[in-house]
Every structure is written in structure tokens, then in C-alpha cells.
From Swiss-Prot:
Compositional bias of kind Polar residues: 1287-1300, 1348-1357
Protein's name according to its UniProt entry: DNA topoisomerase 2
Organism: Plasmodium falciparum (isolate K1 / Thailand)
SUPFAM superfamilies the record matches: ATPase domain of HSP90 chaperone/DNA topoisomerase II/histidine kinase, Ribosomal protein S5 domain 2-like, Type II DNA topoisomerase
Span of domain Toprim: 493-608
Gene, per the UniProt record: TOP2
Positions of the UniProt region annotated as Interaction with DNA: 1012-1021
Cofactor(s) demanded: Mg(2+); Mn(2+); Ca(2+)
Coarse class of the protein's main subcellular location: nucleus
Subunit architecture: Homodimer.
Keyword rRNA-binding in record: no
Length: 1398
């Protein structure tokens, strides 16, 4: 501060005008030249362009104040105004440095203000702090606010002229100011008969802005503001006498979007394409007057994304014009895409151009960000997180709005600061707009950017270290680095990747032979990631792949690397188990190298595999090793396995250290080099692992030929052969475990469960966790752990709606409900199961011998498929996804299926079936060609209450409850007021409260649609393995049924043939035994004091059949274990004559001595006669009759199982009712019968007759007279099961409890003879046999009794049958003390008893 200034000089007071001129930046912004990137009008291109211009913000502001005043006239205009505003005319004369702005509409009163005593135009244009915007109680949507406005333009002008026409007062006003509003003329008033208008003409004082003339930059900026008015004011706008071809905001936006994609390229140094046809396109763009539209082209918006067909541009995403428009009260929005570098916005508040945006722009953008963020991250699942800032950079938003009493950050009004709650209106973007944005290239651009960004980040993460870091690797657990890795000898080093830690240990044992200098070992944790289509997140989080890159010295940024120079290891060796999973691991590693460094695969010697035997066989000094199961199977088919010792090597861990040392000592013969033979190698790798080539993989699997395998005698293996001869076995296996077979409807895991249950004869309850161990042991299940098998068992026992129509296992415990779709099942260690009562009727045990059983590691396991009586694939449906294939088949009603089977047998047309789900109360309706819709039940109780009593199939109660909670808490679209959930684990009951108006609207739209009570059952993807194990897609359910019926009849032919040969075998054995005994009795054959060899030779010469000739019934497959057992007894298997051994006559020579009697001969002759009669019956029966008899038994068994289920449910419901009635009702318990000591030791409560029936297949009549309807149904089923043609069921008034059967000697025994397979004179085949060997000593069931006919005082007489079998084969059956049936013909009644399951 200067010391010589006086106080008066230091402290001054300025007038308002002096202050404005002295400090202009406070009022109009800077008056200095600024260079800034702005949108301006390009006269040559006739559109907006963004470029750097040099201008003075203050000059721009004084022009803006005048044109905003003109726009305010339109904003203040009332509906049906007498003087509507129609146009704004602006003249900008750069040469004369003069600007004028004219507008019509409601004018300024040409009258004297009584307080100011001057004319009103004079006051508002020539007096500071005057305005009509000071009443804050009034809601105004104008641009003016503070009372400066046009006065600032006046102050910064050399000349300022105002002209006004007042039609109501018939006067015209004109007044001129000059020299920065310091001088003014007297108002000039004259009479006027025209319409209202206001015209302001001014000459800016360019000296105040450091300018001498108006240059092109300021002109282009002012022209742009004129176009702004045309787009935001909805009036005609003229510039220098020419009307602007902009009619509305949409056409205004076109001035930015058209060809600006090319401008963005220009900014990056690329060429620009001109397009001067905007005016015509603007006219077209206004043809659609809808409030909401979306366009991706220059064509009229029709809501459908289209490509820009401009011939000057390529039709690619970069050239697409996105224009998504929505118009609401006081708001108009257009959403487009930016170039991704930064967020762009063009916005207006009350016609003011807010160049920096503000709260109104954020208000709109935040709505877009919320939806885009959710969708983008969902589509980019597994990739890098896409944040709101990233998404914002891809948006270009145009906003034109009217805000009540807006506030800005400064007088320059570049940024709106009004809070959204004070906007005076709301603009919630519609769902249609949001959806159109999500479908537009905006989202795809965001995802592309995210992927590009991810690649950059990934390269940083995966980039190999420095050369020094490559010499020694530290910090990688379990790596056994080669001593020479990273050194000058690194090209000679090999990294061995092993499948697991145990394989690594075995490998190290082998390395003790060849040394550690040139070999490193790194164990893989399991299967590598499929990097072909892996996400960013997957790659970034996969430490194992990163470690492999580091160990090898591979750099992900060097995709063209084609040699091994610079690597820490010159080659890579894969050491995995020789099974399907091992092949998959090899494929994944090959896929990884091919994805990142395809050229390395062409380098011979870079990639190899170490192979170990999967099977070894030895016989004496002979030893063979097999490297694939297929190779072993081929050898086995052409070899007599007698005497061979066979050892299976499940994994690398099976080999001993000694064997691994042996392998490495001969490493050349255990090493196969992968070889690149051409482009087909790369194509086959891509086909096997690319998600985009699903159809190619389908064709690949369809052309699969069983028996083609890699020849391990060859030391080179092409990648093409690896994929097509080894990897395909894994893909085939993956599909087999996911897609069921048409014959039994089972996947391998389910088939193993059924096989284990049948083998264990699971009649009594068994804990699921224990059953899993048994099944794994007896079916060679070792692929996916116990948890997977446990879930399979649980699924097979589930009974809730949407699960099984027929459950083949009993759910003894909590096996899940429709509450959570079975996910609420208890742990396997808490629940029990057993075979359901209908299972053995459907999977008839007499089909077991004709099935083709699989063999794994010499162990007989489950069959290729079972052959049920009815097609269970249609009964319970299926769902699965495998390699290249998926399948879905809905459930169907077993009654409809059986009816169609009968039509098939009778050669009648089949009737199409509609899907059916047990206990489902809703509707199932066809939706056309794709399938069916399942529809729940919703009823209107009153005008504000709804009740939902059924949900669609596969829509679970808990999920639906969460859906209702969303409807309740959704602030934007709250549909319901409240809901009450009274659903149980079985039944659905939701009571919903709604606003009556919303309920009525929902009814109009459709309650089932609004409340999502529909689900789809597709019938277009019925893919199954056919009987020949080929994948087949079936068009309809009837195609499946026809295929099944054809194969089922063939199976009955096989069953019949088997039983005939079985009877013939037994007949031949009886005949040989009879001949043998008679020979000994008649001294025709002397067996004592003879060697076995001599005796066998004599038997053969005398025509006795060796057992191997009799045993033609035995299946062709001879299981290896039998041969191994035979190898342990060489004496018995020594060939005596013509291939005959001692064992071939054991069936004769091992007969007990007391059998060598004439009585036995008579007995055998009787048996022989019976066998001949049985054979005659069997040969005469047709396979169709056999099937119909089986179907009858199946129907009865299913009905019985269903009635038991309903009875149990009814009992449960009784408990629920009793609980509601109070404690007193619960005290009424049925008095239990006092148990005997024997019964107590067996846990002998026998009150649950239905459970007793299910477990033992014995029949017991319910004597409780107060039986409910469901109980009667159960009893009716029991009666049907025990009914015999010649026994009146009314005579069976007492309990019938029988567990014994007759053997061929007419003795009561536990052994079931073949005749038990023939139910009646028509040779009906039974499906309800009882295997009494399964009776458990720890069973809690009461032992059934056979009454002693000699005990007249038997206390159990009223609860049992007395059977008296005399020497004349007469059988007396005592039903009650006074009722006895005598039957002379043994075989007839015997068959009748057997029909009862005895």
C-alpha cells in the first residue's frame, strides 16, 4: 500500500454501475480472453462441434441475459393466452458489432410506474435491482432472478436500445442508452395498433472485453446459444433472417449426435466425414410425437434399435447413434453414448445453458447409474468391478427442464445448485427408458471397456519378473525347482506338473533315478481353470495359473512367443491319472498354452505327457501293461482270463516307489510328445473348450465311436488325436452323468443308488450316511464324493409337489419340502431311507438277469440301464446339463402313461399327454409349440384382499415369500400393503392386502401375471441317451414312449428266453442227478476208492453233462473275480479231458450221501415232471400278456404306496387338529395291547399295519371299526393284493400273516423256487416276492406265525392260517375254528398262495 495516499484515496465508495464496471467478474464473469473446449455452431457442417475456442465469458454472458429474457416470456405464458409467443428473432452483425433480439408474446406494459414515476420499460432495462422475480412465494420457472439481467448488458454496451409494443394500451415505447448506461434519451412514445413485442438492440463495448471486433469463435458460440433457444423454447427461432430447422428438443439433440462419432475420431487425429443433410433428418425426427422413444439411427424413432445406414460409414458399433428419449411434465431427457473417455452432458434450466451441469443432471444420471451398474456387473460377473464412475464416462445426457425458483453457483449460472426436493416436479425415468438404455450399445461399450481395462490389469499381474527374478523362484509353496532352472541350461530343463501332492511324492521317488538338476516338480491342486472364456476376476484370483507362469518364466504380454529362449524351463510335462479326469486336466493345460501362447504348441518337444499303466496283468513270467481302459477291454475280449492276475491302478498313488523308479529308468517309453500337425489341431482345442462352440461339441459327441483310443505304442500324439481319441471320453462321461437314459430315466449316480439298494435288499430303514458307504463300495462310486451321492439319495426319496410323482425310496425323516425345493432336508447322518413299496414292482427283479452289467476294476457293478415296467423317465421327468447338451422332460401321470402302453400293446393310436405333478392343485396349459405353463391359484376375497393357495411348479414357498417382501418394500412400485403367510411345508396359503385401486389395476393386467404365478415347462429339449447309448433328441413324449415300448417288449422276449433256459438247466440237472443216483444204487457206477480225475473221465464217457455245458443260461460276461478265485484252486481247475475240470461235476459229486436213495429218485422224478409242466406254461404265454400282468401289479403297488402316503398325511393332520383343540384332546390315546416277552425283545409294537405291510409285504387286516376314508383306501389296496380266484375275500375275516414259502419238496422253507415266478395257471409273473433272508434279527417288527395244526387251543388261532400238509399232498387251510378249506390239487392252491406273496 502506497504511503503517500490519503485516507479519502484509500477508502472509497463507488456507485452500483461503477462497481459493476470495476469488478465485472462478480456479475458477468471474466472479461479476459479464455481458451476452452466448448460446443459451438459450425456453419459449414451445419451442426454442433466441440472444439477449443478463445472467447471472453463476460461478452457471452451479456448476450445470454437478453436471450434468456426472451425465453422467459414463453415460460410465463399462461394456457390460452391472448398474446401467445410464436417466435424469437435474433440478428448478430459481426461487421457492425450490433446484436438485436426480438420476441412477441406478452409484452412489457408501456405505462408509468407510480412509485418510480418512470415508464416500466425504462425501469426494468435502465434501473439496477429492478425485476418482477422478487416474490419468493410465487413459483416461477423463468431464468431471471436477481434484478441484474439486461441491465448488465446495458452497462457493458456502447449503445442499448429498447423497443416495446403494448397492444392493450395501444402504445409503442422506444428508448436509447449509451456510454455504459451513463446516458439515456427521453422515452419516445407513439400510438401503436400491432401485437405485443419486445426488441432489444445493443452494441457491446468491446473495449471493456479487450476486443476490437467480434471474431469467428465468439460468433460460433453465440450462434450455438440461438440454436439452444430453438431446441428448448418450443417457438420458431430466426437467426439473421433465416428460420432455424429445429422444432423441438429431439431434433436439437440431433445437431450433436449426427456425425459426431467421426468428430471424436478427428480429435484423435482421424479424418472426418461430412453430412449436411441434418435439416431433412430433423423434419423426419419429429414425425413421432410419443413421449417415449428410442432410436439408434438417423431414422424416426420407433423403439427398435437399428443400425445407422449412412453410406459414408461402416455399419459397426462405433457408428451407431443412440438416442433414447423421454418426455415428462417439465422434463425432457435424451440419453446417448459418449466415447468412453469422459462423461458428457448438455443441459438447460429454464432455457439457461448450464454448461457445467448441476443437481438436475445428477438427478437423472444417478437413476441410470443404478440400473447400469447392476446390469453391467451382472454381465461382467467374475470380471473387474465396474464402478459408477466408470459407467458415467460412457454416458452422454441431454436434459431440458423447468425448475421452480432455481438457484445457481454464481451469476454466470453455469451450475444448478437447487436440491431435487425443491425442483417443483419429479422425473422418474420409466422402465421402458431404463430397459432401452440397458439394451443399447451403452452397456456393451461399458463391458468392452471393462474387458480392455481388465486385460491391462491382467498383464500387470501376470507379467514375468526380471531376469534376475527368473534365476531363482521363491515364495511358491510345494514347488520343487530344478537346480538348473533359470540358468544357461534352462532350455534343457523340464517342469513336471502332477495331479495332486501324492503324485508329486511318487514323482520325486522316480527323480532319484534321473536326478534333480534338469527336472522340477509342481503339484496341481485339481483341475485348472478353463482360461478360454475365463473372466478377469477368475484369472486375477487364480494363484495356481500365476504360479505356473512364474515358474516357467512365461509372459502373458508376449502372445507371439514361438521359442523357448528366455524361459526358466525348456519343456513342460504333464503327469496325471490315466482316467477321464486326468485327460481333462491335460486338456485344460493344453488349452491354457494355446490361449496365451499358441505358437509354443508348434514347438516340438515343448509339451509332453508322462503315462503310467492303468491296468497290469500277470500270468507266470508274462506281464502286460495297459494305459487305457479301452485298450485293456480289447485285450480282455480276446483272452481267456483263467490264471491271469489283474491289478488296477486307480491313480498315480497306486504305483509304488519301486515302480516309479522303474518308470523313470525307462522314461522314454513312458513319455509321449504332443505334436502340432496343422490348423486342425488348434481348431479342435478351441472346439473342446470354447463356450461359443456348443453346437460343434454336440456334433463332436454325436460322432463319437466307442473303441477308438490313443495308441500308447506311438511316441508322438497330435493335439487333434488327443482331443478326438482321449479327451472325448471325458466329455462323453460328463454328458452321461448329466443326461439320463431313456430306458430307466436314471443318471449313473441314481442307477448306482438303486443297484446298491437292490443288492442290500433294503427293506428295513437304513441311515442315509451309512447307505452311501455301502453304495460306494458295491458300485465303485469314487468320482464326486459322498455329499453328491447323499443328495442323490435324498432327491430319489422326495415327495413334495414338483419333485417325484413316484418316489423310489422312502423318506424316513426330513427329506426336504416345497418350502425351499428340498434344500431344507436334514443332514444325511440324521435321516433314514429304504426301498419304497412300489419300487420292486416297477423295477421287476425277474429282469435283473437279462440286464447288461458294467464292470469296473474287475467288480460287477450296476447295469448299463434298468428296464422298468413303465417308463420312469416320463413319470418323474429329468433335468440336466452336460458337455454340449442339456435336457428337460416334465413329469407325466403314470395312469396316462399306462393307458398309452395298453394302446401300444393293442396297436391303437396313442393319445398325447399333458404334464402332471402329484398334488399340484393349479392348472397346466399349453403355451403353443414350446411347451406348457403351470399356473398357480389366486382368488379375490374382497376389494382389497387376495388369497394365493398354489404356486407354479418349481417356484418354492420361501422364494415366493421373498418376492412378496420386495413388492411390499419397493418404494418406487409398492404394489401390496401387507401379507400373511399361513403356508405349511405341504400347502400354500398367502393372504395379501392391497389398495383397492391397485388391485383393480392388477386384475385388468391379470393377477397371475402381476404376481408371477406362471412357470414354463419346455418340451423342446427332450434329449436322452437311447438304448444304444447314443444321444438322441425326441420331439414329443410319445416318441419317448414308443421307443421305450419297443425296447420293453424286446426285454420281455429276453426274460422269457432266460426263464425257459433257466428251467431247462434245472431240468437237465435233475435228469443228471436222477441218472447218477440210479447208477450208484444199481451198482452201475462205483465212486469209492477212485481218484477225482478217473471219476470225472468216467462220468464224461458215460454221457453225464458237465456243468459248463448245462450252464448256458449264464451270461456271456464272465466276471474277473470268479476267474481270480479259480486261479487260487489250480487242482480243481486242471483240465482232465476235452476242457473238462473237476468242478464241472461238483453238482453230482458233492451230493450228500443220504440223497443216494430210491426215495430221492422218486422226488426228483416228481420235480422233473413239474419242470416240464412249467416249461409248457412258459412257452405258451405271450410277452404282451406278461407285460399286462406286470402293469396290473405296478398299478396296485403304486396305489397302495399312495394310499399309505395319504394315510400318514391324514394322521399328521389329525395331530395338528388335536394340538389346536388343546392338551385334553391329546390325552385320548389308544390302549396298547400287552406284549409277550418275545414281542418285547423284538420291539413288538405292531399297531402300524401299513408300515408293516410296506416292510414285509405280509398282509394284515385292520380290525379297527372306526377307520377313516384314507384308512379304508389302504385296506382296499391290501385286499386287492391278497385276493385269490378260488378264495372269497369275505372268508378272510381274521389276520392273514404268512412269511414262509414252499420249496420243490413241498417243505416250508425260506428258499424261493422258480415256480414262485409263475403266479397262476396263465403264468402270471409275480413282482411281489419276499426275500426272507433279509429279515433282520434286530427288526422291530412282530414275527408272523404259522399256526400248528395240532394245537387246538392255539391262542393265535384268530390271527393266523393253519396249514396241514399230509402225505397225499392234500392241504387243509383253517381260516377260523369252524371254517376249513380242503384242496386236493397241490399245485393249484400252491400257486394261489404264491400269488399272495407267500
Amino acid at each position: 500500500m502506497a504511503k503517500n495516499k490519503t485516507i479519502e484515496e484509500r477508502y472509497q465508495k463507488k456507485s452500483q454501475i461503477e462497481h459493476i464496471l470495476l469488478r465485472p467478474d462478480t456479475y458477468i464473469g471474466s472479461v479476459e480472453m479464455h481458451t476452452q473446449l466448448l460446443w459451438v455452431w459450425n456453419k459449414e457442417k451445419n451442426r454442433m462441434v466441440q472444439k477449443n475456442i478463445t472467447y471472453v465469458p463476460g461478452l457471452y454472458k451479456i448476450f445470454d441475459e437478453i436471450i434468456v429474457n426472451a425465453a422467459d416470456v414463453k415460460a410465463r405464458e399462461k394456457e390460452k393466452s391472448e398474446n401467445p409467443m410464436t417466435c424469437i428473432k435474433i440478428e448478430i452483425n459481426k461487421e457492425n458489432k450490433r446484436i438485436s433480439v426480438y420476441n412477441d408474446g406478452e409484452g412489457i406494459p408501456v405505462d408509468i410506474h407510480k412509485e418510480m414515476n418512470i415508464y416500466v420499460p425504462h425501469m426494468i432495462f435502465g434501473e439496477l435491482l429492478t425485476s418482477d422475480n422478487y416474490d419468493d412465494a410465487e413459483d416461477r420457472i423463468t431464468g431471471g432472478r436477481n434484478g441484474f439481467g439486461a441491465k448488465l448488458t446495458n452497462i457493458f454496451s456502447k449503445e442499448f436500445i429498447v423497443q416495446c409494443g403494448d397492444s392493450s394500451r395501444k402504445k409503442e415505447f422506444k428508448m436509447t442508452w449509451s456510454d455504459n448506461m451513463s446516458k439515456f434519451s427521453e422515452p419516445h412514445i407513439k400510438n401503436y395498433n400491432g401485437k405485443d413485442y419486445v426488441k432489444v438492440t445493443f452494441k457491446p463495448d468491446l473495449n471493456k472485453f479487450g476486443m476490437t471486433e467480434m471474431d469467428d469463435d465468439i460468433e460460433s458460440l453465440l450462434f450455438k446459444r440461438v440454436y439452444d433457444l430453438a431446441g428448448t423454447c418450443s417457438v420458431r427461432v430466426y437467426l439473421n433472417g433465416q428460420r432455424l430447422a429445429v422444432k423441438d428438443f429431439k431434433s436439437y439433440v440431433d445437431l450433436y449426435l449426427k456425425d459426431n462419432s467421426n468428430d471424436n475420431k478427428n480429435n484423435k487425429g482421424q479424418n472426418d466425414n461430412n453430412n449436411n443433410n441434418n435439416n431433412n433428418n430433423d423434419e423426419n425426427a419429429n414425425q413421432n410425437n410419443d413421449n417415449l422413444d428410442v432410436s439408434l439411427s438417423n431414422e424416426p424413432a420407433d423403439g427398435t434399435p437399428t443400425k445407422n445406414n449412412n453410406n459414408n460409414n461402416n455399419n459397426n458399433d462405433e457408428d451407431e447413434i443412440v438416442k433414447i428419449h423421454e418426455k415428462q411434465h417439465r422434463w425432457e431427457i435424451v440419453v446417448s453414448k459418449s466415447d468412453g473417455s469422459q462423461f458428457q452432458q448438455v443441459s438447460f434450466v429454464n432455457s439457461i445453458c448450464t454448461t457445467k451441469g448441476g443437481s438436475h443432471v445428477n438427478y437423472i444420471v444417478e437413476q441410470l447409474l443404478s440400473s447400469l451398474s447392476k446390469k453391467a456387473n451382472a454381465k461382467n460377473k467374475g470380471g473387474m468391478e465396474i464402478k459408477s464412475g466408470h459407467i458415467r464416462n460412457h454416458l452422454w445426457v441431454f436434459v431440458n427442464c423447468l425448475i421452480v425458483n432455481p438457484t445457481f453457483d454464481s451469476q454466470t449460472k453455469e451450475t444448478l445448485t437447487t436440491k431435487p426436493v425443491k425442483f417443483g416436479s419429479k422425473c422418474i425415468l420409466s422402465d421402458k427408458t431404463i430397459n432401452n438404455v440397458l439394451k443399447s450399445p451403452i452397456l456393451s461399450n461399458i463391458l468392452l471397456w471393462a474387458q480392455a481395462k481388465a486385460q491391462v490389469e491382467l498383464k500387470k499381474k501376470m507379467k514375468a519378473g526380471s531376469s534376475k527374478a527368473r534365476e531363482r523362484i521363491i515364495g511358491i509353496p510345494k514347488l520343487e525347482d530344478a537346480n538348473d532352472a533359470g540358468s544357461k541350461y534352462s532350455q534343457e530343463c523340464t517342469l513336471i506338473l502332477t495331479e495332486g501332492d501324492s503324485a508329486k511324492t511318487s514323482c520325486l521317488a522316480g527323480l532319484s533315478i534321473v536326478g534333480r538338476d534338469k527336472y522340477g516338480v509342481f503339484p496341481l491342486k485339481g483341475k485348472l481353470l478353463n482360461v478360454r472364456d475365463a473372466s478377469f476376476k477368475q484369472l486375477m484370483d487364480n494363484k495356481e495359473i500365476q504360479n505356473i507362469f512364474r515358474i516357467m518364466g512365461l509372459d502373458i504380454t508376449d502372445k507371439n512367443k514361438d521359442d523357448i529362449k528366455g524361459l526358466r524351463y525348456g519343456s513342460l510335462m504333464i503327469m496325471t491319472d490315466q482316467d477321464y479326469d486326468g485327460s481333462h486336466i491335460k486338456g485344460l493345460l493344453i488349452n491354457m498354452i494355446h490361449k496365451f501362447w499358441p505358437s509354443l504348441l508348434k514347438h516340438k518337444g515343448f509339451l509332453s505327457e508322462f503315462v503310467t499303466p492303468i491296468v497290469k496283468v500277470q500270468k507266470g513270467s508274462q506281464e502286460y501293461s495297459f494305459f487305457t481302459i479301452a485298450e485293456y477291454e480289447q485285450w480282455k475280449e480276446n483272452t481267456n482270463l483263467l490264471g491271469w492276475k489283474i491289478k488296477y491302478y486307480k491313480g498315480l498313488g497306486t504305483s509304488t516307489d519301486r515302480e516309479f523308479k522303474q518308470y523313470f529308468s525307462d522314461i522314454k517309453n513312458h513319455k509321449i510328445m504332443f505334436l502340432w500337425t496343422g490348423d486342425r489341431d488348434g481348431d479342435s482345442i478351441d472346439m473342446a473348450f470354447s463356450k461359443k462352440r456348443i453346437e460343434d461339441r454336440k456334433l463332436w459327441l454325436q460322432n463319437f465311436i466307442l473303441g477308438s483310443y490313443v495308441d500308447h505304442k506311438e511316441k508322438d500324439l497330435s493335439y487333434y488325436d488327443f482331443v478326438n481319441k482321449e479327451l472325448i471320453y471325458y466329455s462323453r462321461y460328463d454328458t452321461e452323468r448329466s443326461i439320463p437314459n431313456i430306458m430307466d430315466g436314471w443318471k449313473p449316480g441314481q442307477r448306482k443308488v438303486l443297484y446298491g439298494c437292490f443288492k442290500r435288499n433294503l427293506r428295513n430303514e437304513c441311515k442315509v450316511a451309512q447307505l452311501v458307504g455301502y453304495i460306494a463300495e458295491h458300485s465303485a462310486y469314487h468320482h464326486h464324493g459322498e455329499s453328491s451321492l447323499q443328495q442323490t439319495i435324498i432327491n430319489m426319496a422326495q415327495t413334495f409337489v414338483g419333485s417325484n410323482n413316484i418316489n423310489f425310496l422312502e423318506p424316513c425323516g426330513q427329506f426336504g419340502s416345497r418350502k425351499e425345493g428340498g434344500k431344507d432336508a436334514s443332514a444325511a447322518r440324521y435321516i433314514f431311507t429304504k426301498l419304497a413299496s412300489s419300487t420292486r414292482s416297477i423295477f421287476n427283479e425277474y429282469d435283473d438277469p437279462i440286464l447288461k452289467y458294467l464292470n469296473e476294476e474287475g467288480q460287477k457293478i450296476e447295469p448299463q440301464y434298468y428296464i422298468p415296467v413303465i417308463p420312469t423317465i416320463l413319470v418323474n421327468g429329468c433335468e440336466g446339463i452336460g458337455t454340449g447338451y442339456s435336457s428337460f422332460i416334465p413329469n407325466y401321470n403314470y395312469k396316462d402313461i399306462i393307458d398309452n402302453i395298453k394302446r401300444y400293446i393293442n396297436k391303437e393310436p396313442l393319445i398325447p399327454m399333458v404334464p402332471w405333478y402329484k398334488d399340484f392343485k393349479g392348472r397346466i396349459e399349453s403355451n403353443g409349440k414350446t411347451g406348457y405353463e403351470t399356473i398357480g391359484i389366486i382368488n379375490k376375497i374382497d376389494n382389497d384382499t387376495l388369497e394365493i393357495t398354489e404356486l407354479p411348479i418349481k417356484k418354492w414357498t420361501q422364494d415366493y415369500k421373498e418376492f412378496l417382501e420386495e413388492l411390499l418394500t419397493d418404494e418406487k412400485h409398492q404394489l401390496i400393503l401387507d401379507y400373511i403367510d399361513n403356508s405349511s411345508h405341504e400347502d400354500i396359503c398367502f393372504t395379501i392386502k392391497m389398495d383397492p385401486a391397485k388391485l383393480q389395476k392388477a386384475e385388468e393386467e391379470g393377477l397371475e401375471k402381476v404376481f408371477k404365478l406362471k412357470s414354463t415347462l419346455t418340451t423342446t429339449n427332450m434329449t436322452l441317451f437311447d438304448p444304444n447309448l447314443k444321444l438322441q433328441r425326441y420331439s414329443t413324449e410319445l416318441d419317448i414312449l414308443k421307443e421305450f415300448c419297443y425296447q420293453r417288449l424286446k426285454a420281455y422276449e429276453n426274460r422269457k428266453s432266460y426263464l425257459i433256459s433257466k428251467l431247462e438247466k434245472e431240468k437237465r440237472i435233475i435228469s443228471n442227478k436222477t441218472k447218477f443216483i440210479l447208477a450208484i444204487v444199481n451198482n452201475e457206477l462205483i465212486v469209492n476208492k477212485k481218484k477225482k480225475k478217473v471219476l470225472v473221465e468216467e462220468l464224461y464217457r458215460k454221457g453225464y453233462d458237465p456243468y459248463k455245458d448245462i450252464n448256458k443260461i449264464k451270461k456271456e460276461e464272465i466276471f474277473e473275480q470268479e476267474l481270480l478265485d479259480a486261479a487260487d484252486n489250480p487242482e480243481d481247475n486242471e483240465e482232465i479231458i476235452a476242457g473238462i475240470t473237476v468242478k464241472d461235476y461238483d453238482y453230482l459229486l458233492s451230493m450228500p450221501i443220504f440223497s443216494l436213495t430210491l426215495e430221492k429218485v422218486e422226488d426228483l422224478l416228481t420235480q422233473l415232471k413239474e419242470k416240464e409242466r412249467e416249461l409248457e406254461i412258459l412257452r405258451n404265454i405271450t410277452v404282451e400278456t406278461m407285460w399286462l400282468k406286470d402293469i396290473e401289479k405296478v398299478e396296485e403297488a403304486i396305489e397302495f404306496q399312495r394310499n399309505v402316503e395319504l394315510s400318514n398325511r391324514e394322521e399328521s393332520n389329525k395331530f395338528k387338529v388335536a394340538r389346536k383343540q388343546g392338551p385334553s384332546s391329546m390325552k385320548k390315546k389308544k390302549k396298547k395291547k400287552k406284549l409277550s416277552s418275545d414281542e418285547e425283545s423284538e420291539g413288538g409294537d405292531t399297531s402300524d399295519s401299513s408300515e408293516f405291510l410296506v416292510n414285509t409285504l405280509n398282509i394284515k387286516k385292520n380290525t379297527n371299526k372306526k377307520t377313516t376314508t384314507s384308512s379304508n383306501n389302504v385296506n382296499n389296496s391290501k385286499k386287492r393284493l391278497r385276493k385269490a380266484d378260488d378264495l372269497n375275500s369275505n372268508e378272510l375275516d381274521n389276520t392273514l400273516s404268512v412269511s414262509k414259502t414252499f420249496d420243490d419238496n413241498n417243505n416250508l422253507t425260506d428258499n424261493t423256487p422258480l415256480i414262485n415266478r409263475l403266479n397262476d395257471e396263465n403264468n402270471e409273473f409275480s413282482s411281489n416276492n419276499v426275500d426272507n433272508k433279509s429279515t433282520n434279527k434286530n427288526s422291530r417288527k412282530k414275527k408272523p406265525k404259522i399256526a400248528d395244526s395240532t394245537n387246538d387251543n392255539n391262542s393265535e388261532l384268530n390271527s393266523s392260517i393253519q396249514i396241514n400238509d399230509n402225505v397225499n399232498d392234500d392241504i387243509n387251510i383253517t381260516i377260523s375254528p369252524n371254517k376249513t378249506i380242503n384242496v386236493n390239487e397241490f399245485s393249484s392252491i400252491k400257486n394261489k398262495l404264491l400269488e399272495l406273496g407267500i
